[in-house]
Amino acid sequence: MDFLIVLKALMMGLVEGFTEFLPISSTGHLIVFGNLIGFHSNHKVFEIAIQLGAVLAVVFEYRQRFSNVLHGVGKDRKANRFVLNLAIAFIPAAVMGLLFGKQIKEHLFNPLSVAVMLVLGGLFILWVEKRQSWAEPKIADVDALRPIDALMIGVAQVFALIPGTSRSGSTIMGGMLWGIERKTATEFSFFLAVPMMVAATAYDVLKHYRFFTLHDVGLILIGFVAAFVSGLVAVKALLRFVSKKNYIPFAYYRIVFGIAIIILWLSGWISWE
């Protein structure tokens, strides 16, 4: 196996893991970074593998919580509420994705759309953070979330179907806008990532499994492990960060990154294939 290809697969896995749970759009980063380093492996199969690695990082980090929920479903009120909330939050984006996913990929999966959504998302984060600085959050614990709160987060997640929006960004900011405390919204976004990404991965596997070859196994394992490790680091670091600070630095980063994408695209450094 060529060392340079291995290095590129490792770097792509790290990018996925580090960006999946930050409100900065992992999709935008993967496309730009993949273009810049010239990574052209079996794209969809590799993408499935690194997404699965990232989501397993959340499962591992919250393994005790998920274990308690699995053992408590049907018997424990908190566990039942937790599962119900995840199901409610899952439905809007799942339904809209099935109905309009193909059209969105055809018409919005381009540099301009991603760049615009990165910039608009950055401005939205600035506004939400300013609003929460004077509006006291009503909910400060995941177990205190009501079904209506989960529904509002689920509705916000629909916007993440547009490339460049960021799934974590839309759910966290949607939760904060609804009156949920920053860290609580972040944790629920992590939990919601599990059913969303598992469902998306399963759907993609059914569509693309025939493109899998034994030749891809090595690169897939490298990307998977890299995404898992970097995802675990990102989850832990983000929780520590939002316990003391806000998301404003990520807002400015999004704006700069969005402008950079347009510059790179116009200059011919990246393509969208």
From Swiss-Prot:
Primary localization: membrane
Function: Catalyzes the dephosphorylation of undecaprenyl diphosphate (UPP). Confers resistance to bacitracin.
Protein name, UniProt field: Undecaprenyl-diphosphatase
Cellular compartments annotated: Cell inner membrane
Listed Pfam families: BacA
Catalysed reactions listed for this entry: di-trans,octa-cis-undecaprenyl diphosphate + H2O = di-trans,octa-cis-undecaprenyl phosphate + phosphate + H(+)
Transmembrane regions: 13-35, 45-62, 82-102, 108-128, 144-164, 186-206, 219-239, 250-270
Any one cellular-component term (Gene Ontology): plasma membrane
MF (Gene Ontology): undecaprenyl-diphosphatase activity
GO BP: any one term: peptidoglycan biosynthetic process
Name of the gene this protein is made from: uppP
Disulfide links within the chain: none
Membrane topology listed for this record: Multi-pass membrane protein
InterPro entries: UppP
Keyword terms: Antibiotic resistance, Cell inner membrane, Cell membrane, Cell shape, Cell wall biogenesis/degradation, Hydrolase, Membrane, Peptidoglycan synthesis, Transmembrane, Transmembrane helix
Similarity-based family: Belongs to the UppP family.
E.C. number(s) listed in UniProt: 3.6.1.27
More info: Bacitracin is thought to be involved in the inhibition of peptidoglycan synthesis by sequestering undecaprenyl diphosphate, thereby reducing the pool of lipid carrier available.
